[in-house]
Swiss-Prot record:
Residues 37-63 are annotated as: Disordered. This is UPF0370 protein PC1_1167. It comes from Pectobacterium carotovorum subsp. carotovorum (strain PC1). It is found in: Cell membrane. The keyword Manganese does not apply. Belongs to the UPF0370 family. It comes from the Bacteria.
Length: 63
């Protein structure tokens, strides 16, 4: 761990460089083109649909 005490500034420079490169790459993302060409999501599967109406303990809404 003595090397960490001696070279902490190199690790800090590397982390700052990674952060700056990440920000630059995120700025290059064209979100409008992605939203226009977004793939369709499959329909939602409701895994509780067979229990939805059976033995409903909640009171019914009165009109």
């Amino acid at each position: 761990m003595a090397w960490l005490a001696d070279y902490w500034w190199i690790i800090l420079i590397i982390l700052i460089g990674m952060l700056i490169n990440g920000i630059k790459e995120l700025r290059n993302v064209d979100h409008t083109r992605f939203l226009l060409n977004k793939p369709k999501l499959p329909p939602h599967r409701d895994n509780n649909d067979k229990w939805d109406d059976e033995d409903d303990d909640w009171p019914k809404k009165k009109p």
